[in-house]
Amino acid sequence: MKNWMYAFGMAAGLAVTIPVVAQQYVFDKKIALPGDGGYDYMAIDSVNHDLFVSHGTSFNVVDLATEQPIAVIDGLKGVHGIAFANVVNKGFISDGRGKAVVVVDLTTFEKVKTIELPAEDEDGIIYDPYSQRIFCFCGDSKSVCVIDVHTLELVKAIDLGGGPEFAVSDGKGLVYNNIEDQSSLKVIDVKTLAVKATYPLAPCGGPTGIAYDPGHQRLFSGCRANKGLSVVDAVSGKVITTLPIGAGVDAVVYDGADRLIFASNGDATTTIIRQESADQYSVIQTLATQPRAKTMAMDMKTKKIYLSAPQFEPGTRKIVPGTFAVYVYRPA
């Protein structure tokens, strides 16, 4: 979709309409990583400028200044995600098969503590700066476990009544969590540690990734069942609009500075959406990526996006050994 700027002719006094072409993304490079295990979330520690890539029983760490691997956090049982509490210089890894959250030092990458949880399938995990607590979402238990980043102790396990996927904090006292098996969104009050509201997301089905625009108080939920991205009013819960995206979405990122939304999809595409206003959106690019490259992180400094995936044998889900990598895309 074209946006329009208006320049006024000094001499003629006439308005001249000039089209502005939206920024396109292109492939930049591939960063090869060791190992042949499964993979899930990626996340960027913006303070230390490191990229963390989940990979089977370990996390690969990439220095974003050089875009080279610098460490491996291993000895885990089945990692999913990591959340950063830079206030204590610690990362919190969700270890689904270990039924725990593993705490690591963000400078040395050494394990500090394993926090065993009364839950199963630890998956999505975020840091809430308002409460200075970690929220670890546990799929099989249909709950979220809350951890104090200072004491490294479990504060409470909250029943969600459905299978949680990813979540986002508004930084002001609320956490929003996609409930995949109910096609809804839970609003969690971080002060009372209770579910405050439930927002139905229809026509969205099977919501996974989620991002938040604090300026317009809009939520962006990526939905697998209908291959759509739903824009939701965070205050009322109203679904404003739904945009078409690729199949198998897993991650959603919002770049507030450039007003762009990215949805990474398992069908070898990343859908890029332009935010025209709080309630108006348009798809501006379907970026060709890699098959099953469905997880993503964005460096807000460079505007690069990072997606991870191995190569697969044709027509199968069998991984070709030694092919796991991070694929980097940048503005053209």
List the predicted regions and their residue ranges.
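N-terminal secretory signal peptides that target proteins for export/translocation
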Residues: M1-K2
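Bacterial N-terminal signal peptides
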Residues: Y6-T17
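Predominantly soluble domains enriched in secretory-pathway, periplasmic, or organellar proteins
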Residues: A15, V21-A332
